[in-house]
Design a protein with these regions (language model features):
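A short acidic, Gly/Pro-enriched loop at the edge of an enzyme's catalytic core
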Residues: 115-126
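A short glycine-rich, Lys/Arg-flanked "PGG" loop and its adjoining helix->strand segment in the class I
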Residues: 142-154
Length: 276
């Protein structure tokens, strides 16, 4: 299939910022995250924390951190330190900072656009639970990966969840996904840069959230990562032992056969092969 370089919808990503500001302001973000607890705990968390590994005492930067849902866990459960979270949405960061004041963990939060990432420090680990699929083209992906490469310490790692390159919309059971995991897709164009329309939170139609992002094919991301100076490694999601015991293996059959996301771990080489 011919590769296509989709045009930007809004080059400064104000659409994404405005949307996440709105859902944080009206409470749907927090409510939706709570509704998706089964998915997060049993489908997404296991692969994230397995690949993240032992980060006790390691500096960690969490990009696209939202209200700090994972940022706090990387600090409190995994022992990463120091920890910083950055997000494009001021309202998300306001919420993260409020929680930090109420339950201090020593996390620093900042509003920022990863495409203009500029920090005066380095980190041993960079995470981004959902980021790359919000970018609009290969040029932007390369820019962001170079920014991340620049803030990583020697042989640091970038751990990120990304829209599944092999997701098959024809096999997607929307009703099953919504009833069990509080999300579904209403659109997923095939091919590199194909638009995906995602509805998280399990809301009724009148309150439904609609999030659009793009799928990027595996070989495209691998090539860009390699050009920047990363070694890419893909990981499939798997179900937690607790989830299997509580719900049974068949409960997760549809999800595992066609998961919404996969994990990409990029390990930094000593020097980038092709500097910009």
């Amino acid at each position: 299939m011919k590769q296509r370089e989709p045009g930007r919808r809004k080059s400064d990503h104000t659409n994404v910022k405005d949307q996440y500001d709105e859902v944080q302001r009206d409470g749907r973000y927090e409510e939706g995250m709570a509704r998706m607890a089964v998915y997060h705990r049993h489908c997404q968390d296991p692969v994230i924390f397995k690949v993240l590994g032992d980060v006790r005492g390691k500096s960690l930067l969490d990009l696209a951190c939202g209200d700090g849902f994972y940022t706090r866990r990387f600090r409190s459960l995994c022992g990463a330190s120091p920890v910083m979270g950055i997000d494009l949405s001021p309202k998300q960061i306001e919420r993260a900072q409020m929680i930090e004041r109420q339950q201090p963990l020593g996390i620093e939060y900042r509003v920022g656009d990863v495409t203009a990432l500029a920090l005066d420090r380095h980190f041993e680990v960079v995470t981004a639970i959902h980021l790359l699929h919000y970018l609009e083209n290969a040029t932007e992906i390369e820019l962001v990966l170079r920014k991340i490469y620049g803030v990583l310490d020697h042989r640091g790692r970038f751990v990120t969840m990304i829209a599944n390159p092999e997701f098959d919309f024809a096999r997607h059971d929307a009703a099953d996904s919504k009833s069990k995991f509080a999300y579904y897709f209403s659109r997923a164009e095939p091919g590199n840069g194909g638009l995906m329309r995602f509805h998280p939170g399990g809301f009724d139609k009148e309150r439904e959230l609609t999030v659009e992002f793009r799928r990027w094919e595996r070989h495209v991301l691998d090539r860009i990562a390699d050009d920047v100076g990363f070694t890419p490694e893909w990981h499939d999601p798997f179900i937690s032992a607790e989830g299997l015991e509580r719900y049974g293996a068949s409960f997760f059959d549809n999800y595992l056969a066609n998961p919404q996301s996969k994990l990409l771990c990029l390990s930094k080489l000593i020097e980038p092969r092709n500097k910009p």
